Amino acid sequence: MSHLNYNHLYYFWMVCKQGSVTKAADALFLTPQTVTGQIKALEDRLDGKLTKRNGRSIEPTELGQLVFKYADRMFGLSYEMLDIVNYSQRSNLLFDVGVADALSKRLVSKILLTSVPGDNRIHLRCFESTHEMLLEQLAQHKLDMILSDCPVDSSQSPGLFSKKLGESRMSFFSFGDVDFAPFPAVLQSKKLLVPGSRTAMGRKVRQWFDRQGLQPHILGEFDDSALMKAFAIYHSDAVFMAPSFYVSEVDAESSLKLIGHVDEIKEEYYVIFAERMIQHPAVKNVCDADFTNLFL
């Protein structure tokens, strides 16, 4: 049996990972026709059909699933090899981290500090996006690690792992005058700034409103927690939701006032990484760190 053309195998692997020829072609900087031709050559070599159409997506046939399983292990090992070579040869380790935009930037910053080794041999690059987009980039080996507000579903994303780092209670704050009314009923008379409905925290908040029988006036929804706080500074009549550790600013920053705590709602923090990154020194630092004193 003659040797396999690994370029053909790689293009097939990318199509399976991306779910379509067009997306794979974009990722490979090739035309869809070129990718299709390469997969056809692989099918001729293996004497069998590797893909089939399912609506607008491409999925592997039974033979394709078998080939993809081995290809996934092969190319996963190749990326792992490159990472290990990179660790041993670079004076500064390049470490690309994706951060879910819904998370508190202050807490994220403190978590990231633990990723930096004592000798500072690291070149940290941070990128913000949604949980879903970051997972896609991690699966494509464009990121080394993710900090997010929800774990990864290993059944949907094989080869990816998550570890819970901690959770923070949530509270409502305002930069304006505070009414001495019972909480949470006081929220009915306020303009609220809350996390976006597509975020994990946004869904938790709305469920809590329903349980409390509240129908508040929502002035704005924000996926970015830092932007929500900045907006609240310039709209002092609004009330915004943030991790409870913000209460430490109430004394130091006199204009910030606590409206009330919500013990039932917790903002969770997870680190997500690929199996090949387990030995990365920065990932190990984060996974091994004790964040007990960081979260309220």
UniProtKB/Swiss-Prot annotation:
Keyword Cytoplasm: yes
UniProt protein name: Transcriptional activator protein NhaR
Pfam families: HTH_1, LysR_substrate
Gene source species: Vibrio cholerae serotype O1 (strain ATCC 39315 / El Tor Inaba N16961)
Segments forming domain HTH lysR-type: 1-61
UniProt keyword terms in alphabetical order: Activator, Cytoplasm, DNA-binding, Transcription, Transcription regulation
Domain of life: Bacteria
InterPro entries reported for this sequence: LysR_subst-bd (IPR005119), Tscrpt_reg_HTH_LysR (IPR000847), WH-like_DNA-bd_sf (IPR036388), WH_DNA-bd_sf (IPR036390)
One Gene Ontology biological process: regulation of DNA-templated transcription initiation
Residues of the DNA-binding region: 21-40
Subcellular location per the Swiss-Prot or TrEMBL entry: Cytoplasm
GO cellular component: cytoplasm
Entry GO MF terms: DNA binding; DNA-binding transcription factor activity
Primary residence: cytoplasm
Family as reported in the entry's similarity comment: Belongs to the LysR transcriptional regulatory family.
Function comment: Plays a role in the positive regulation of NhaA.
Signal peptide: none
